[in-house]
């Protein structure tokens, strides 16, 4: 009779150990339970200022790094590039197709209304990523500059996902109304011109900017179209949500039939982060 409690205790300990082993095995099969699919990937190190999609040898350009990076994988820069400028000349995406609002119009009541969210054409982007993107120049004392210097107007960077940008300057971007691709998904979506949004950076997600300078970027809508499609929004930055720390946003503009957010236009809400940023 006295042995039964001891047997029960041993059985309880055995079940506890077995449960722990099963849990550890499950975590191991899921990448260690890190929340990011396992150990963090080593950063991709950009070692050239040249704008080239398929560089030869051991050369790594920013464009090639963005193409090969996994979602959220850190992209850094070789110390020899400190203070350098990457002059972007390649249009990475001629028709940047992303989800956007389609508005209808109630003529009798003279009001517009939201039809829904469908694919829209946001025009040319020099760099385009359909994943979380992490560009980190924080190890460079003078950072890195991304400058659009191509022939046709294009925004500097578009991201369908979250963007983390550290110690990077963005300049020279232009987002303009132009002939749109035929991607209409709804009778009310009669988009004929590309949407002028985020000439510097356009992010369909959270834009986290730290120690960045966004300057001299310009969004130009259709001056003859007073609808939302004809407007221009976010000369410097256009994003669902923006978190900015120690940033300068200056000299960016918007113009068109309707325009807002010459420096920053936030679709969902703004968070200035832990320290003050300057927007002018």
Question: Across the structure, where does each feature detected by a protein language model lie?
Answer:
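Glycine-rich beta-solenoid repeat tracts in large extracellular/virion proteins
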Residues: 103, 113-116, 124-129, 155-160, ...
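Short glycine/acidic-rich loop motifs that flank beta-strands on beta-rich extracellular proteins
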Residues: 149-154, 174-181, 218-226, 253-260
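N-terminal, post-signal-peptide segments of secreted/periplasmic proteins
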Residues: 30-197
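Ser/Thr-rich, Pro/Gly/Ala-heavy low-complexity intrinsically disordered linkers and tails
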Residues: 35-39, 210, 234
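Right-handed parallel beta-helix
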Residues: 141-143, 164-174, 206-221, 241-253, ...
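Bacterial N-terminal signal peptides
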Residues: 15-26
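N-terminal secretory signal peptides that target proteins for export/translocation
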Residues: 1-11
């Amino acid at each position: 009779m006295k042995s039964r409690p001891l047997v029960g205790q041993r059985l309880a300990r055995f079940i506890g150990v077995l449960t722990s082993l099963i849990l550890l095995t499950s975590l191991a099969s899921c990448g260690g339970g890190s929340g990011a699919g396992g150990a963090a990937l080593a950063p991709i190190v950009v070692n050239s200022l040249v704008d080239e999609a398929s560089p030869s040898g051991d050369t790594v350009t920013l464009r090639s790094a963005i193409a090969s990076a996994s979602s959220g994988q850190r992209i850094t820069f070789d110390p020899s590039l400190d203070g350098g400028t990457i002059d972007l000349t390649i249009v990475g995406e001629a028709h940047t197709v992303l989800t956007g609002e389609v508005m209808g119009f109630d003529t009798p009541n003279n009001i517009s209304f939201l039809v829904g969210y469908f694919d829209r054409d946001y025009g040319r982007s020099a760099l385009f990523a359909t994943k979380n993107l992490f560009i980190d120049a924080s190890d460079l004392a003078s950072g890195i500059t991304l400058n659009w210097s191509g022939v046709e107007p294009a925004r500097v960077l578009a991201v369908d996902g979250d963007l983390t940008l550290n110690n990077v300057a963005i300049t020279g971007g232009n987002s303009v109304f132009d002939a749109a691709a035929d991607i209409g998904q709804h009778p009310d979506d009669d988009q004929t011109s590309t949407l002028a949004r985020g000439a510097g950076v356009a992010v369909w997600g959270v834009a986290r900017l730290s120690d960045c300078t966004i300057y001299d970027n310009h969004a130009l809508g259709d001056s003859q179209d007073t609808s939302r499609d004809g407007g221009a929004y976010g000369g410097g930055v256009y994003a669902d949500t923006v978190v900015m720390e120690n940033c300068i946003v200056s000299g960016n503009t918007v113009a068109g039939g309707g325009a807002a957010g010459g420096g920053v236009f936030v679709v969902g809400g703004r968070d200035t982060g832990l320290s003050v940023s300057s927007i002018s």
